Amino acid sequence: SLILFVYARERPPQRTQGRELSAAHRIKEVRTSFVGTGIGMVMGNKGAVGARVVLSSAVPGGRDEVCTFVCAHLAAHDHNVQRRHAEWRAVCERLVFDPMSVQVLPPLQEPVSQEKPATIDAVDPHAYSLYDTHHLFVLGDLNYRLATGVEGVSPAGRHTAPGTFPPITRGDVLQVARTFESQRWASLAPYDQLVRERFAPTPRTMHHLHVPDMSVYHIPPTYKYKARGEMEQLSTKRLPGWPDRLLWGSSDASAGNQAIQCELYRSIMRYTYSDHKPVTAIVQLPP
């Protein structure tokens, strides 16, 4: 199952007088949607849920700003790369935010503001895709694993000369896994399936989104650990990898400029109640 929570922080009046309002005060509309991509490309064991949030401008007379959040869970297993591509295409095509999906906004807490009655009227009568937004955030268990038996590519998207990252084997990966050294984990980043598919000569998936470079952040694999085991106790039943991701894109982005700036990207290694490690990020939106 999938669930997505979107929170907006309130700021007290003394923090907002003469300055931009807090995000909670600026929310004009929230629409939600979901799509199943599991069995028969319709069942909900795989798929995505999304929320489209419209915020009024922080500057008087400025444009509204739209942030769209999508939580996805794509097909599992190392070999199912093409299935993951197909499921993401289905999400892009079928995750639609129509006027009927508008949600009632929860009231802000007193004494921050004097609340008006909640409304479920849509801002406009149009339906929108996940790309009809200023900022898009995609998160969840995307299930892209490590690719063995093939050459790697530069995680930064630079041209990769043949032989730069020679093929690795399952044994190579497991040897690195036994050491659990962050610098050695970085050496596996060129073999991340998501990176290889994004930077293929003809990009195959998610090339419009920014994917944090694991060789820069030195994040250990987020999967597969022994649930309720030691903090760094990887399972030998699966190859480790980075299926759990936070990606983003902005309509203001240009070549070499992602617009959204990442201040922190990390995994929570102390969480041991699952065979996955949660991933968190702090990003700054452009003014």
Ranges and model annotations:
Residues 5-6, 32, 65-76:
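Active-site-proximal beta-strand elements of phosphoester/diester hydrolases
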Residues 3, 47-49:
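Residue-level marker for the onset of beta-strands and adjacent loop->beta junctions
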Residues 1-42:
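Active-site surface patch of divalent metal-dependent phosphodiester/phosphate bond hydrolases
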